[in-house]
Amino acid sequence: MRQLYYTLQTLIRGKGSNLIKIISLGLGLAVSILIFSRQAFELNYDTCYKDHERLCLVKTVWYYNNEYHPSHITLGPVAGTIAENLPDEVESVTVTQQWWSNSAWFANERRFQTNAMTADSCFFATMGIDVVSGDPRELNNPEVVFISRELAGSMFADKNPIGQTVVYNKQMPMTVKGIFEDFPENSSFYGSGVVMSLATSFKHHWGYWGWGGGDSYMSFVRLRPGVQLDDVNTRIEKLAEQVRKSDDVFISLVPIKDYRMEFGISTMRMVWILLTLGTAILFIVAMNYVLISISAMNRRAKAIGVHKCSGANTGTIFGMFLWETGVIMLFSLLLVALLLFNFREPLEDMLDVSLAGLFSWENIWAPLSVIVILFMIGGMLPGQLFARIPVTQVFRRYTEGKKGWKRPLLFVQFAGTSFIFGLLGLVLMQSHYITNKERGFDYHRVAYASGVSFDSDAESDANRSVMLSLPYVEDGACSSNLLTDGLSGEGVTTDNGQWMSIRWVEFGKDYAPFMKLEFAEGKNMDAPGQILVNETFLKMMHWEDKPIGRQVRNGDRIAGNIVGVLKDFATSNAAYVAVQPMYATYLDRFSGNIQLRLKEPF
């Protein structure tokens, strides 16, 4: 305790330099802790499920245009076929559709916003999510939903939700048959509060189910204990060839924890860039603390000599500096806590995770590691130097004539600062490129409502007229999908009989000009049986020469005749996915995703 007493006395006398140390360490710790904790959280994604080591996602790789195109979206029957043919290796499988992000649900005339999905009765058992109440087998019936515990509390408070009615988009009533535990923040399903039955999708034809197209499903497979993933993938590859009878699609399983990295939602490259940035910041902060501490050597040399004359040994002096570093870091951590508390909302918005999730028990090792490393560098380096000051220093006049030790530290600081600013500039340039990349259509000032349907053409036309007559609406149109969300999966048959996976969407008659899609040739659709294609579609089909009038088909099913060719535009996330071949068919009713372009100012 005597060491701590002398340490506190020293800190009180040097309060000016200590304030600089606290602010410097506080800011550096805050940034470093946030960077390292966020990357630890990223690497911990989708490990929240029970026995996640046995949980896999079905990966489909399509081969066309002499290129391989991996996707986490697959054909509907894939999971069931795997389960039927590999019963000794597979414990359970499930199929979902992830189309209803930020959808509107109504209970007792109150509106709730949440992500929704469809799933079969094996979903919760396969994913390892606890069911609070209800029988998952109810998901075999149409118009049935399971809701999360949090959403159930918001909708029905203390009432029993089982048997209650919720209405999707004020149009489709469904019955609550169960409650499940909320998805954790490190789940890719986080924010999904509603699980609709897959039977509802079948009833309302929300996607094609078959081997001939409609790759619109996410499928998950839970392996039995002790089963090797590589062995299963070898058998699945042969199975896919037998079922599909073609070599244009490859199916395999990937661990659920690799989902985000495997399919470009996140990348190890960005993780390493941010880890490098965090390491550089941490190193510069530590060196800055060491430099400030050592610069006080001329003031503190005599005091250290006095301590040694009083019986303090090298270990005692070293311990005093460790105490000093610990106290300063304690105040710095209080500053960090103050900053995090006051800037909580913008930080959570930038990090895309709550601070509670960021500093959960699974990730607490990351901030603790930052603190320990900084303590070791900041405490041990100056502590060793000061502990070596001889006792005779009390009888000498200390001069700061030799300043060579400062130059290496200053060089490291300036070099590190230059590196940090250079790396930040690179990240900002990449971010600017991604966020401002030309997508080939105009989405500015466009508001939308999803899942809209009407019972008749007259009702549809009446609602369209009302919407377009609003004083703040400039124009309006509709489509089956939002271009910013990606398009549905579909298949086409080439002239030589080969089946290929492409993207498909329905456009209302005014949608192409509404989104300012440019035509390479031909005209817009104005009747059923007409379709639009993009330039990549023509390259895939080798139809660059005179495409107008050609017939597009999927096996024996005819999609329509080409009347126009659109210039290529982003069909998915332009930052990660190249332009995909697509065609658009005619949507004859004002429904689906209704989009309105608003007048300025809003």
What spans do the regions from the language model cover?
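Membrane-helix entry/capping segments
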Residues: 1-4, 9-17, 49, 235-280, ...
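Intracellular coupling helices
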Residues: 5-16, 20, 285-328, 388-399
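Short, strongly hydrophobic transmembrane alpha-helices
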Residues: 6, 13-43, 406-430, 441
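Alpha-helical transmembrane segments of integral membrane proteins
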Residues: 17-31, 271-291, 324-336, 363-371, ...
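Small-residue-rich transmembrane alpha-helices
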Residues: 34, 240-241, 325-389, 429
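Membrane-proximal extracellular/periplasmic loop immediately following the first transmembrane helix
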Residues: 35-102, 203, 212-222, 230-235, ...
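Short juxtamembrane loops and helix-capping segments at transmembrane helix boundaries
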Residues: 43-52, 191-205, 261, 338-365, ...
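Mid-to-C-terminal secondary-structure elements
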Residues: 120-133, 145-266, 465-602
